[in-house]
Amino acid sequence: MKFLLTVLTALAFSQTALAAPSCYTQAEAVAEQAIRIHSELMDIGLNCQHMTPSGQKNLYQSYREFTAQHSGLFAAYENTLLGYFQRTGAKNPEAALNTMRTEFANKISLDSAKMRPDLFCGHYMPRIQRVSTMGQSDIQKWASTFFPGHPTTRPVCGQK
């Protein structure tokens, strides 16, 4: 009986050690925020491109240029999240990342569906215009700023 208890205890501890926590590291939380921001900008650019003010660059084109200019930064954020999904045992980390992006885009699409297009675009369009002038450090600072209305989908390890 004592042997069985020892084996079961050892097994329990080994399973605990093998199980990766599902909470985010700080870097993973920042990466999620960055991917959420990027997904929202895409949706804004697509939904509001027809309302681009006269004489200004098409909003979706501005979004695409912003993406190209900062592709390395967003690729690094994606790699961080792929690492999270691998660490937590996702069968297909890339599919998990794509699902996350889709869920973020769907949320802003639902917000846009609840508003008249002119009101939605009037409210969100300035984001595209603002990011077109941002440098990498500005984007990193934005992604590192957590807002109560936009919590991460998972808790950050060690935070309550």
Segments the model singles out, each with a brief description of its role:
Residues 30-73:
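Early exported N-terminus immediately downstream of N-terminal targeting peptides
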